[in-house]
């Protein structure tokens, strides 16, 4: 091919200029708007279906995820059985359930809570009259009416509870009153004080006022032994919380539910029949050996001397010889 020969360009189709009609632009705008409206309606319907609450038995979640209601309790409720819609009933039950458990939990706590005169306040000011939260006053009233002095074994229970955070037997044994002499002597001394109303007693005074009366002998021993807690609810704590929440729900007319704590307390609020599973440890394995059926409003307690689930293990200690220590003093 000659250098001077010109390269042939491919033949291109001739360009044609087309003018768009301006007649249908308003119609197009209307169609686009209608399409957007239809899409918005479909999206809203989809969201409505997602947020729709179905009637029937459902777990009621706490409004606050960092709360006693979501960490230690389960509330199942028959939504829509009353006059309210399932969604409205779910919201009202959840708000009341969460609020009562939060307030009662703070009142019964042995940790300082800003602006709350709770159990911690009472323990830090023995022999003083203190106006406390109504929930704390009610808890001591319940124990007094029941003739229970379990709350006064708090120092012993506090030492015993330390056993369950241990990893090795050598650590655990120093908190075990059955295996360690010093721990046994401490437990015996605290038990003697706990049984004696002249040594320690919570007095119920008017206007939600409590006085934690502690004898001079007990105060001296507490100072020498590093005891700062004279009263605490221990394993009764969740029972008191469960009753407080259940009573509040019933008083507000919400009775279509069952409230239970993870450590074995339960309250049925209505006449529905419900079942309680019975477990037994056989040859190192956990087996469901039966079911107990109940009907009508009832309060139930189910304790186990062994861990049944992986999450249970933090509340028990198993020695290398196979002995299981449960969280209940006897």
What role is predicted for each listed range?
Residues 2-330:
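Mature catalytic core of soluble alpha/beta enzymes
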């Amino acid at each position: 091919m000659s250098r001077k020969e010109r390269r042939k360009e491919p033949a291109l189709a001739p360009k044609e200029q087309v003018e768009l009609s301006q007649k249908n632009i308003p119609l197009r705008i209307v169609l686009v708007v209608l399409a957007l409206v239809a899409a918005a309606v479909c999206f809203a319907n989809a969201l409505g279906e997602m947020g729709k609450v179905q009637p029937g038995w459902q777990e009621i979640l706490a409004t606050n995820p960092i709360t006693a209601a979501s960490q230690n309790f389960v509330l199942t409720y028959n939504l829509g059985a009353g006059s309210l819609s399932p969604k409205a009933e779910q919201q009202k039950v959840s708000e009341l359930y969460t609020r009562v458990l939060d307030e009662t939990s703070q009142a019964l706590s042995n940790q300082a809570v800003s602006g709350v005169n709770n159990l911690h306040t009472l323990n830090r000011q023995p022999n003083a009259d203190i106006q406390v939260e109504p929930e704390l006053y009610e808890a001591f009233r319940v124990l007094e009416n029941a003739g229970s002095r379990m709350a006064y074994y708090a120092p012993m229970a506090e030492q015993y509870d330390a056993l369950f955070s241990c990893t090795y037997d050598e650590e655990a044994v120093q908190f075990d009153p059955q295996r360690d002499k010093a721990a046994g002597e401490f437990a015996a001394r605290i038990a003697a004080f706990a049984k004696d109303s002249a040594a320690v007693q919570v007095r119920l005074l008017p206007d939600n006022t409590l006085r934690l009366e502690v004898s001079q002998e007990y105060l001296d021993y507490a100072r020498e032994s590093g005891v700062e807690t004279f009263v605490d609810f221990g394993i009764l704590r969740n029972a008191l919380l469960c009753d407080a929440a259940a009573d509040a729900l019933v008083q507000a007319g919400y009775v279509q539910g069952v409230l239970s704590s993870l450590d074995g307390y339960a309250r049925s609020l209505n006449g529905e029949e419900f079942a309680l599973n019975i477990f037994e440890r056989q040859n190192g394995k956990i087996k469901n050996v039966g079911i107990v059926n109940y009907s009508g409003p009832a309060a139930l307690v189910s304790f186990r001397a062994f861990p049944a689930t992986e999450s249970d293990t933090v509340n028990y200690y198993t020695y290398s010889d196979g002995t299981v220590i449960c969280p209940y003093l006897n």
